[in-house]
UniProtKB/Swiss-Prot annotation:
One of its GO terms (cellular component) is nucleus. This is GATA-binding factor 3. A zinc finger (GATA-type) spans 256-280, 310-334. Disulfide bonds: none annotated. Residues 357-370 have a biased composition (Basic residues). Keywords: Activator, DNA-binding, Metal-binding, Nucleus, Repeat, Transcription, Transcription regulation, Zinc, Zinc-finger. Expressed in the embryonic nervous system and in adult reticulocytes. Its main location: nucleus. One of its GO terms (molecular function) is RNA polymerase II cis-regulatory region sequence-specific DNA binding. The keyword Transferase does not apply.
Amino acid sequence: MEVSAEQPRWVSHPHHPALLNGQHTDSHHQVHNYMDPSQYPPPEDMDVLFNIDAQGNHVPSYYSNSVRTVPRYPPPHHGSLVCHPSILQSWTDGRKSLGGPHAASAWNLPFTKPSIHHNSPGGLSVYPPASSASLATGHSSPHLFTFPPTPPKDVSPDPSISTSGSTSSSRHEEKECVVSKYQVSLGDTGMKLESLHPRNSMSGIGGVSAHHPITTYPDYYGAGLFQPGSILDGSPTHFSSNARPKTRSSTEGRECVNCGATSTPLWRRDGTGHYLCNACGLYHKMNGQNRPLIKPKRRLSAARRAGTSCANCQTTTTTLWRRNANGDPVCNACGLYYKLHNINRPLTMKKEGIQTRNRKMSSKSKKSKKFHDSLEDYPKSSSFSPAALSRHMSSLSHIPFSHSSHMLTTPTPMHPPSSLSFGPHHPSSMVTAMG
C-alpha cells in the first residue's frame, strides 16, 4: 500500500500503540553512506526495518532516536524515528549512494543480534557482528561501528514476516531494551555526543567521516594543563621557578666608610647618610663616635707583669694585683686581707703556691646540677625499691592492722584501732570507720 505525503513511512508517531508496548531500541540510525542494494544479504537474514500494515498504520521501526533514549533512558513511549531528508532522497534514483566507501561516525553502533528471532539476548556492543563486517566492504579498519543499510522507498517488506516478528518479539525487545541501556555505556561516553554537532553530521554525507570511535578531547585539556615534559621530564619551569637563589645585587659596591668592609650581615648609615658596617654602626650608635680602627693593646696578665712586686710580701706572682691605701701595688692575698681586717697581712701566712678555686660554675648552674643529681638519685631511693619498702613497712609496724601488708597511713586519732580492722570476717568495720 502506498503512503501519502502527509504520512511518511520513515517517521512513526511517538504515541503509537506499538511503541507504548515497549517495542523500541536504544539506538539512533543516522547512516551517512550506503552500499549498493545488490550487496545486501538475503531478506530472511535481515531484520525487518520498517513495515506498514494493511490499514495504513505505521508499525514500530527497528531503530529509534537514541539522542533521547540513551542519555536519559526515558519510557518506551517517548521514542521517535528520525531520518535525514537527504538520505531519503538518495534512494529515489536507486543508482548510487551519497558517499563512496562506508563511513563510520559516532552514531554507527552495530546491533549484535542478527535477527529479531535470535535466541540469545543482545544489545549494543563495541565490536561489530559478523553480518556488519561482511557488509562493510569499503570500510576502513579504524572505523568498526556500522549499521545495516536502510532499504529504499520502493522496497516493501514482507507483511507476514513483519506481523509475526512484531507479535512474537515484543517481550524479547523489552528485555533487549533493558540490556542495551546498560551495554550502551561506552557509546554514551565516547561516541554519543559527537554527531550532535551539525558539522559532524554533515561530514558523513559529503564523504568519509574523519571521527574515530574513541573519544577525542579538546586542545585545552592538553595544552594548558599538561604540557609535554612538565611531569615526566621534570622540567624546572613548573616546580623550581620559585627556588631562585637569593642574590645580593643591591649590596654590591657598598663599602664601610669607617673600616672599609665590603660584606656585613647588616648595612647601617651614619648621620651623614654614609654606609657603615654592622660593627661600626653599632659602635657609633652606642658611643657617639667612630669605631677605632686599631685595636688597643691588651694589658699583660697581672701574674706576668714585669717589675711588679707586692709591697707587703714581696711576691711577684698573683692572680690579681691590687693597691693599698698608699697606692702601692700589693698581691691579691695581701690586698684582700687588708680590706677585710684593716691590717697588713702577716708574712707567716705567705705560701709558695697560689691556692685557687674553680669559679667557672655560677650559682645557677650549681643549683641546676644539684637538681639533676637529685633526679638521678631519685630512682635509687624510690619508694618502690625493696629497701624503701622495707623501711616504710618498719615505720608502719607500730600501727595495729589486722593485715600486716596493708600500706595505708591513716592517722590513728581519727580512726580507732577497732575501726581499722579490714579483715574479711568483720564486714561491719568498714561501715563503722566511714560512719
